Regions:
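Structured DNA-binding interfaces in DNA transaction proteins
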Residues: 20, 101, 128
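Surface-exposed patches in mature extracellular/periplasmic domains of secreted proteins
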Residues: 8-9, 76-93, 97, 126-131, ...
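A penicillin-recognizing enzyme superfamily signal
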Residues: 6-7, 105-205
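Mid-domain, small-residue-enriched loop/turn segments at the edges of structured enzyme/sensor domains
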Residues: 24-28, 60-112
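Secondary-structure capping and boundary motifs in well-ordered enzyme cores
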Residues: 32, 36, 40, 44, ...
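Extended, hydrophobic alpha-helical segments in both membrane/secreted and soluble proteins
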Residues: 1-2, 7, 51-52, 64, ...
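Conserved catalytic neighborhood of penicillin-recognizing serine enzymes
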Residues: 5-64, 95, 137-168
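A short secondary-structure junction motif
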Residues: 18, 47, 71-76, 122, ...
Length: 205
């Protein structure tokens, strides 16, 4: 959305930094980066950690945090800066939390659903709703809960780019087993260390 990259932008499967023990970071599911060039779309399709971190570094964690909290509804879960009772400081404004999901408190399923819906709603963030309306016994509207019309993306093309990448994920990427016969699907997988948690967030555009 910032005009910095597109799905076809070439990036490299390589570590960005070294960790405290001198090991390259990030790794790809415990494997060393290959150093090969690939498109951002290919990185998303194959869930390559190094590509996610390279792109986040291009965008900057601060800009990404601001976008998520101000335009995609994640303001209640993401931690800007928190000082704990023992004096330690925590923040989600960094590469690992925002590029790889290593968040301080995590996010909710509802927030993820709201964020993903932006990709199939022409870039508009409509929020999330538990109900649309309530009728009385005669069919009169008692309560109505209309969707929001806040702009998630400045450029609607960004939503289309992301949707195209996520359609590749379900077509032939890490979520290729989630296709539904006769229905278009798109989504993104995510795992924690040793596959303790396995996530999939998807849409049917």
């Amino acid at each position: 959305d910032a005009g910095i990259a597109t799905p076809d932008t070439t990036v490299y499967d390589r570590a960005l930094i070294q960790d405290e023990e001198g090991n390259p970071w990030p790794m790809n599911d415990g494997k060393m980066p290959t150093g090969k060039a690939m498109s951002i779309k290919s990185g998303i399709t194959s869930s390559v950690n190094t590509i996610a971190v390279q792109v986040m570094n291009m965008l900057t964690p601060q800009a990404s945090y601001d976008f998520l909290t101000q335009r995609l509804g994640f303001e209640d879960s993401l931690v800007g800066t928190r000082t704990n009772a023992d004096g330690t400081v925590q923040s989600d404004i960094d590469l690992a939390p925002l590029a790889l999901g290593g968040l301080t408190d995590g996010v909710t399923v509802r927030e993820m659903a709201g964020g993903f819906s932006t990709f199939i709603n022409d870039g508009v963030f409509a929020g999330t709703r538990t109900y649309t309306k309530v009728l009385d016994s005669e069919g009169n509207v008692v309560l109505e809960n209309n969707p929001g019309t806040e702009l998630g993306f400045e450029n609607v093309r960004t939503a289309y780019y992301m949707l195209d990448c996520m359609q590749a994920v379900t077509a032939y990427g890490t979520a290729s087993g989630t296709t539904i016969s006769g229905v278009e699907t798109a989504g993104k997988t995510g795992t924690t260390t040793s596959n303790t948690d396995i996530w999939f967030c998807g849409v049917t555009p």
